[in-house]
Amino acid sequence: MATISKEEIKEAIKNMTVLELAELVKELEEEFGVSAAAMVAAAPAAGGAAAGAAAEEKTEFDVILQSPGDKKINVIKVVREITGLGLKEAKELVDSAPKAIKEGVSKEEAEQFKAKLEEAGATVEVK
């Protein structure tokens, strides 16, 4: 039996079409009794656990718009400034309150965003 190096395998895979790669994956799954989908499904679970650990440390905060208040137009302007959204998207976000405006930001940023939104007339919560 001839020994094939990893480099030779990688080169062979690089030269394959998408259809050929799909067939190869199916054949490997059948040959070894595994599923490529199981690996993909396991990856987000690990990411979710890492996110849970970060939330416990409280280094990341979410800015949540509870209510736009009476000055809805001013709040929409501030939401656009903070998020970089277009006018339509910012309006939809404000109309769907309570809603997270920014997620996973530092405490300082969260407090700045909260101050801007409250100055515009909104009711805001930082979690």
UniProtKB/Swiss-Prot annotation:
The UniProt entry's GO CC annotations, sorted and at most eight, read: cytosolic large ribosomal subunit
The cross-references to InterPro entries, in alphabetical order and at most eight, read: Ribosomal_bL12, Ribosomal_bL12_C, Ribosomal_bL12_C/ClpS-like, Ribosomal_bL12_oligo, Ribosomal_bL12_oligo_N_sf
Q: Which GO terms describe its biological process?
A: translation
Q: Name one GO molecular function term.
A: mRNA binding
Return the Pfam families for the record.
Ribosomal_L12, Ribosomal_L12_N
Sorted UniProt keywords: Ribonucleoprotein, Ribosomal protein
Matches recorded under HAMAP family: Ribosomal_bL12 (MF_00368)
Q: Which family does it belong to?
A: Belongs to the bacterial ribosomal protein bL12 family.
Main function: Forms part of the ribosomal stalk which helps the ribosome interact with GTP-bound translation factors. Is thus essential for accurate translation.
Assembly and partners are described as:
Homodimer. Part of the ribosomal stalk of the 50S ribosomal subunit. Forms a multimeric L10(L12)X complex, where L10 forms an elongated spine to which 2 to 4 L12 dimers bind in a sequential fashion. Binds GTP-bound translation factors.
| The name this protein goes by in its record | Large ribosomal subunit protein bL12
What gene is this protein translated from? rplL
